Amino acid sequence: MGFRVCVIVVFLGCLLLVPEKTMAQEMKRASIVIQGARRVCETDENFVCATLDWWPHDKCNYDQCPWGYSSVINMDLTRPLLTKAIKAFKPLRIRIGGSLQDQVIYDVGNLKTPCRPFQKMNSGLFGFSKGCLHMKRWDELNSFLTATGAVVTFGLNALRGRHKLRGKAWGGAWDHINTQDFLNYTVSKGYVIDSWEFGNELSGSGVGASVSAELYGKDLIVLKDVINKVYKNSWLHKPILVAPGGFYEQQWYTKLLEISGPSVVDVVTHHIYNLGSGNDPALVKKIMDPSYLSQVSKTFKDVNQTIQEHGPWASPWVGESGGAYNSGGRHVSDTFIDSFWYLDQLGMSARHNTKVYCRQTLVGGFYGLLEKGTFVPNPDYYSALLWHRLMGKGVLAVQTDGPPQLRVYAHCSKGRAGVTLLLINLSNQSDFTVSVSNGINVVLNAESRKKKSLLDTLKRPFSWIGSKASDGYLNREEYHLTPENGVLRSKTMVLNGKSLKPTATGDIPSLEPVLRSVNSPLNVLPLSMSFIVLPNFDASACS
């Protein structure tokens, strides 16, 4: 039986602007073998996730204040483009949380403290006071989230009732009353929450604060009991429990799972900011270095191993990842070049059994998928949307004889039989002709071709557009992504020669492939990304 295959091809380089004579100086061949007989692991159906944070408009880093009005408490939820950008995913998982979530008070029940907005305060965590979520705003958020069809993960305050001991360490029992009142209100209104997450970056040595694994584990048992009681007689589906939303430290995570015990925590989350600080002058160099990008694979592997050994009832998620911390890198995180890091992260994490990957942020900072204020999609938005539409749950093993710069990931196609490949080429000079096989049969041969100019090379893949090739044979779909005008720091992504921008009516543009005969050569350009669909690929794991 024939199967359809999707290939995602991503090309990276080390220059920000690459002239035509530099791209395609070297013609190389590479063979790819997809092991389609079995799935090595599976992601969640809604693997792609984006976050909404709590930062006020005056949150600043490096003398820059890139947040504006983009947070849970102050974002304009009536903007049509924001709604359409989320709806395009059908659905998008949204995680509400961030550094200030452990200072949020919920304005419900018998609240004994004033419910005021976040204000700058030198003695406060991350330089801010405690803040408040009014139920009127919670109602507005849920109306918005329901209208967009979002799958919601909400991060709860895990410091309520605790006190500071020394340094970053906090102690004392968690006060669950305000959280329980908040959950009761949420259920009484019929608001659908997929998952409740407990705390943000309190694990191990912590970031602004830390809580011991012993205390954390015991409090998770309390929270699980609260969730069970609140949802016991409700028609709503009981949400899963997610924790701890911090940076992975093996000993702390192991102890947390041992203390909380079987079936308390459903999902174990960790955060990734493997590119370092947002003002690092080496940020671009790191994105373009395959050996650097590969270093974080050990974290994905170790998290999964810790869960398998000490909490096999739970699943691993990346609960937050923005590449560069402290709001991201200006003119990097919001440009085309960041998709090289982002798509590599999606492929690598999925290969290590990560079920969900939450991008920091949907809106806010320099790393937003959408531009703050205008909500115009940045390049990574389209990378996320194409992944979500084309990459299925099943992860396959794949090998290549290509150089280290050519990185390869494989998935079953989404919503249809077939396989999806993600290829990342970190060379700014090599133009590859790729052959694809299942280890037995060559599906796509690498055919020799003469060296051509960049313009000729781009024209050829875009020559057949439509639902059927002119010769009537089976086609593959190709989605070629390039930066506008060849500038890697461009804020505009180009799909098959067409700039991706909201339409005149304010809609997300359609993402249409070009069609080519499956027998024609598959050519992959430097510094570009491509999704390619191949029919008749023998992958029984994807039937």
UniProtKB/Swiss-Prot annotation:
Pfam family, one: Glyco_hydro_79n
GO CC field: extracellular region; lysosomal membrane; plant-type cell wall; plasma membrane
Residues glycosylated per entry: 184, 304, 425, 428
Keyword Glycoprotein applies: yes
GO molecular function, one term: beta-glucuronidase activity
Record: active site: 201 (proton donor), 320 (nucleophile)
Residues in the signal sequence: 1-24
Mode of membrane association: Peripheral membrane protein
Domain of life from the UniProt record: Eukaryota
EC code(s) of this entry: 3.2.-.-
Enzyme class: hydrolase
Compartments where located: Lysosome membrane; Secreted
InterPro entries named among the record's database cross-references: Glyco_hydro_79, Glycoside_hydrolase_SF
Gene Ontology biological process terms, A to Z: unidimensional cell growth
Role of this protein: Endoglycosidase which is a cell surface and extracellular matrix-degrading enzyme. Cleaves heparan sulfate proteoglycans (HSPGs) into heparan sulfate side chains and core proteoglycans.
Family label: Belongs to the glycosyl hydrolase 79 family.
Name of the protein described by the UniProt record: Heparanase-like protein 1
Phylogenetic classification of the source organism: Eukaryota, Viridiplantae, Streptophyta, Embryophyta, Tracheophyta
